[in-house]
Amino acid sequence: MMICFVFLCVLTFVRGEIYPSTCPALGAGNGEAVRSGEMLLEISAYRNWRSGKMELWGSAAVNNQVFYGGMEDSQIEYDFGKFLVFRCFQVFHNVHKLLFNTVSSATMHLARKRVQKCGHGKMTFISIQVQCSVNKKSIRLSRMNETNLKKQVLRVAFFLDGSNNSWIADKNFQGEDRTMLRLWTELSTYRQYLISSCNNDVKVLSELYGEFRRMALSYDEELKLNFMPVIRSSSERLFRADDLKCSFSRWLGAEGEFAVCEYSGWGVSKLGKIEIFAEEPLTFDMVWKTVKMRSSGAYTSLFRDDVTWGLISLDKWVGDKYFCMCTNKESGDNVIVTLPEKNVEKSIQIYNEGSTMLAFAEITSIMVNLMFMGAVAVCVGILGISCFVGLKEIIYFIFVSVNSMWPFCNKLLTTAVNCFFKGRTFLRRELKI
């Protein structure tokens, strides 16, 4: 037994790693870092093992407002997060060289083996996260996986101790991982570049934001940078996986009412797709039509989930029914969420307007019905009386009454008598015709 134990220890020492029985638990994250007014810039590089292609990724967040995470070859739209990330493209290039050219093949082999040990084999992330603040700086080296769009992160954080300018490994962040510590040792020569880049980004942040405002406003005059919308109602559905969610909510802002569709979960900013449909009235039918989203994009939360979102203005569409479709582009699965009904105030207004129109219609209908019923009653009365005194006497009575009440009807009565009572002299004499 003792010999076997010694042999196991020697074998473990040669391999350089003791694999734990289970993977480290997922950490809760350091969300307070963003809320404390820090800027975060996350830069990732990974190889798609199916295609063999190297891909780069970046995301930025300021003051708890997550802006955007995009690929290296993504189209740079007019979003501040994208603008900030791709202004730092040199960091992408250096991380690419560092992770896949500088790091020894033995260390990468251990990292890949560690990933396979935890059941991840589809894609492998290696991420460097730079966190900037006045009193604290940190770099997090992460290894992530996107199998089935579920978050599986093995991460070790290193914080800079300001008192003696030394690095401290936070082993309790998500558990000790010797492979990542070894990989970090090889990356340590690059940390000063990352810190200087981080400090420089903080200094020019306000300048970049001002430049973004000028550029964005020149392309979109309706862009509202400081609006604070209020949510009215929301509906959501979970995807087949527990960590994916599709929601559709109705908002009210200064520029009117609008709807926001969000597809959230780990990895959906790259593998997720959303579409918004509106029911449009035609001449004889209703048809569902794809709505062009005025503002759309994907952004990555550094401490929570990825989110793909789209926004439409409801004031520009006549239809009352909308739904959002969230699709996993890799598997083809989708979820459909219907937009909630209109807000209470607008519903009350529409109800009041409808009630007023309905009351007017009811009064008009009652008056028409009364007139019709009166006419029917008169006709029935005339027919009933004619059975006893004869039709000639009734008509005679009507003509005499009209002639006495409205003398100006003489010409009309003369014509009627000539047509219906030719030769009846008694009627002519009585009417003085």
Swiss-Prot record:
Glycosylation sites recorded in the entry for this protein: N145, N164
Keywords: Glycoprotein, Host endoplasmic reticulum, Host lysosome, Host membrane, Host-virus interaction, Inhibition of host innate immune response by virus, Membrane, Transmembrane, Transmembrane helix, Viral immunoevasion
Residue intervals on the Lumenal side: 1-370
Bilayer topology annotation: Single-pass membrane protein; Single-pass type I membrane protein
One GO term (biological process): symbiont-mediated suppression of host innate immune response
Coiled coil feature spans: none
Ranges of the Cytoplasmic topological domain: 392-433
GO cellular component, one term: membrane
Location within or outside the cell: Host endoplasmic reticulum membrane; Host lysosome membrane
Transmembrane segments: 371-391
Entry function: Plays a role in escape from immune detection by associating with and diverting properly folded class I MHC molecules to an endolysosomal compartment, effectively removing them from the cell surface. In consequence, surface class I molecules are down-regulated and infected cells are masked for immune recognition by cytotoxic T lymphocytes.
Domains: entry comment: The ER-lumenal domain associates with class I MHC molecules and is responsible for lysosomal sorting.
Family listed: Belongs to the herpesviridae U21 family.
The name this protein goes by in its record: U21 glycoprotein
